């Protein structure tokens, strides 16, 4: 009997070694770029059947203080992480002779690696001379002390239920807002998402906070900002790990967030600018960063009179259709979404026991604000389907390059100017020109960027 048990132990050990060897063969280590600075592996990226978009955040959290790429790194350096197993569905079967073997499942890194930016050491971009009290993101006067901070880039959901219930908070106080298609779906759940940039104002409430997408590693480095978000697919998280930015994933930074448990998962995760900045200071990540910013001018340009801009055509999702209407009295564009209904932002104070799923408690009277912008900029760029599975509905991530050059439409002061955008690297701001190649200046104030596919047709009036 003892002999039989011993043979069983030896056999089981042998099988275990074979399984481990097979797993190692399926997951080759990534080849770091020459400028990367390796460090000891930290907590592995959690795997799940779907990203935060499909299910609420897990309550099974790692110990506070564990990190997912949250260490601030100089531009040109990043920290590769060990590969993790993939929950992505297997690749389609290989085409060819009948009976040919199916292709091996694509790993997280195999799906994500083609979209990894070539971060390197670039010469510092000279910051234009401007008064210390002029916000480089808006061109407006601001408290100089507020400008000596790291910008926050918050991922904010835009599902129809969020707008219907007036759950948006903080958008009206952002300096910049980017709106983009988040996924390519063949079902009715497609929508857009916002990346809102906060520097000169500190909203008491920001939300609802949602998951990150691969577009974020292209916009956050130019701001040297901190990305405020909640989870994402394994492929997206791996890409964030290779990117020089402050990563404030809610999963690993629970004390910076709270929950309004009266809402569904699409609207319940919230934060405040004050709390995020307290968390940055505790971690030693808050600092003044040089921002090149945009060019601004009070002088209205010559252009085609346009008072209404609407995004209603496919592939823009029906649930996210939006119109901007020029208001001559204020000199701003008012946002309507869904069409015909003002898109409202709610401003109200909040108290919370931060972290570990703590409840958000709002205090005081809600103040609703109609979202507006001094500039609406439409950027045209490629939208490429990827193999990165983003949620349990098998929606795939969209690669939207924001470097290079492309067409642009600039709307300010009730006119449209056709032009171009250009950007050499992820660390640089966009440069805007009109159709004649002359620099184009934005109107001082808030700018909303609508990022659309090449050839997308706007509805203009």
Q: What are the functions of these language-model segments?
A:
Residues 2-12:
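Bacterial N-terminal signal peptides that target proteins for export
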Residues 3-4, 24, 259, 361:
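Secreted/luminal cysteine- and crosslink-motif detector
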Residues 12-13, 87:
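A periodicity- and composition-biased signal for non-globular, repetitive helical segments
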Residues 23-130:
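Ser/Thr-rich, Proline-interspersed low-complexity disordered segments
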Residues 106-178, 185-461:
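A surface/extracellular/periplasmic glyco- and lipid-processing/surface-interacting theme
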